[in-house]
């Protein structure tokens, strides 16, 4: 019997690269995505298209309301998504696009799904560039959540270890794109933008777009998605 894996899938290049990596193993894949605000609704639409390229046993989209977490540009309509011209302008501290406890919420859902379906492996696409800005993307956080998962679940208490996998944790965005291209990821079906237009164009100026464009440029490859 195949082992089961839960993958957090956002529709961006990082989680899609993780999906590609896991798809080349013997895991039976259960993908989990979240619809939490209008600004990420396009991500959910994109996922429906890209997931058809993979042998995914089940894909769940969880609707959750994170708008009560005011103070983040990704959940608060009163805060504009910051725009930049290049990587030199990107913030070195925690940006306003940080969503309080987001990965803790997402991983908690993934943990619940894993217990229900009998999975012991959870995959997430955090990486080096992420944990420069987002505290819930750091290696220490991943290790701590894994420790909590094994203390707070029936399977963990019974000695069936739950593992949180972050296969990109030591990679930069540039290295992730390089790896994905080598594996054959179709990045035209992904989106990174924090502030896309209603017709699906990426803004090209938010933190995520700037980082994505820079990663493709460093790989001497044209980003296949459309920008404003």
Curated annotation (Swiss-Prot):
GO function terms (MF aspect): ATP binding; ligase activity, forming carbon-nitrogen bonds; zinc ion binding
Keyword RNA-binding: no
GO annotation, biological process: queuosine biosynthetic process
InterPro entries named among the record's database cross-references: QueC, Rossmann-like_a/b/a_fold
Superkingdom of source: Bacteria
CDD domains (alphabetical): QueC-like
Catalyzed reactions: 7-carboxy-7-deazaguanine + NH4(+) + ATP = 7-cyano-7-deazaguanine + ADP + phosphate + H2O + H(+)
Residues holding ATP: 9-19
Cofactor notes: Binds 1 zinc ion per subunit.
UniProt record similarity statement: Belongs to the QueC family.
Function as written in the Swiss-Prot or TrEMBL entry: Catalyzes the ATP-dependent conversion of 7-carboxy-7-deazaguanine (CDG) to 7-cyano-7-deazaguanine (preQ(0)).
Descriptive protein name: 7-cyano-7-deazaguanine synthase
